[in-house]
């Protein structure tokens, strides 16, 4: 089996460019990817004799058993299966698409939805209580491996990850650097202010498996 990693640049609808990493697995035995009972797995993306593993937009590992990304679509399902996910934390208010729900059901993945509006206004308040509820789910190792995502994987996802970093005792400079790496030119002062004043004193437990904590 040979892994070939390709990075491509694609233009989004709004004119911005983003990078996707496509991992091609050559010489794949298709029988390996059959569902129980011998039926073909409908969520595997196979072209010829190659299996294409395409991460979602803005995909990255946050910590042991924690991942982040933009909204995954059917092209990303094969890649997500390799993560062995138990849970997804979804931070948008819109209903989850039926195709995504079917993917979760077929893979035994639990969905936690904390609907946060995707406001573009600079001074709109982020709902503190929803971030807290999402953070509690995130800290529970029974839910790992877990994927956090919103629409683009920038602002709402960035705020939740930033609050996790604060709990891990990261300095604000490092928290903001990570946030800005994903938000880029779309970084919002209101998001960074929210992370700065977010009170983590009510959270007393950080799983020992977390590798990015300052202990």
Curated annotation (Swiss-Prot):
Optimum pH is 5.0 (with polyphosphate as substrate). Its EC number is 3.6.1.52. Residues 58-209 form the Tyrosine-protein phosphatase domain. Changing residue 150 to S: Abolishes activity. The record marks 156 as: Transition state stabilizer. 1D-myo-inositol hexakisphosphate binds at residues 125-126, 129-130. Residues 114-126 are annotated as: WPD loop important for active site topology. Keywords: Hydrolase. The active site is at residue 150. Changing residue 117 to A: Reduces phosphatase activity toward para-nitrophenyl phosphate 2-fold. InterPro entries: PFA-DSPs, Prot-tyrosine_phosphatase-like, Siw14-like, Tyr_Pase_AS, TYR_PHOSPHATASE_DUAL_dom. Inhibited by manganese, calcium and zinc ions but not magnesium ions. It catalyses: 5-diphospho-1D-myo-inositol 1,2,3,4,6-pentakisphosphate + H2O = 1D-myo-inositol hexakisphosphate + phosphate + H(+); 1,5-bis(diphospho)-1D-myo-inositol 2,3,4,6-tetrakisphosphate + H2O = 1-diphospho-1D-myo-inositol 2,3,4,5,6-pentakisphosphate + phosphate + 2 H(+); 3,5-bis(diphospho)-1D-myo-inositol 1,2,4,6-tetrakisphosphate + H2O = 3-diphospho-1D-myo-inositol 1,2,4,5,6-pentakisphosphate + phosphate + 2 H(+); 6-diphospho-1D-myo-inositol pentakisphosphate + H2O = 1D-myo-inositol hexakisphosphate + phosphate + H(+). One of its GO terms (molecular function) is protein tyrosine phosphatase activity. Highly expressed in siliques and at lower levels in roots, leaves and flowers. Belongs to the protein-tyrosine phosphatase family. Atypical dual-specificity phosphatase Siw14-like subfamily. Homodimer and homohexamer; behaves as a monomer in solution. Cleaves the beta-phosphate at the 5-position of soluble inositol pyrophosphates. Has highest activity on 5-diphosphoinositol 1,2,3,4,6-pentakisphosphate (5-InsP(7)), 1,5-bis-diphosphoinositol 2,3,4,6-tetrakisphosphate (1,5-InsP(8)) and 3,5-InsP(8), but has weak activity against 1-diphosphoinositol 2,3,4,5,6-pentakisphosphate (1-InsP(7)). Dephosphorylates the phosphoinositides PI(3,4,5)P3, PI(3,5)P2, but not PI(3)P, PI(3,4)P2 or PI(4,5)P2. Possesses phosphotyrosine phosphatase activity in vitro, and can hydrolyze para-nitrophenyl phosphate, O-methylfluorescein phosphate, polyphosphate and ATP. This is Inositol diphosphatase DSP1. It comes from Arabidopsis thaliana. The gene is DSP1.
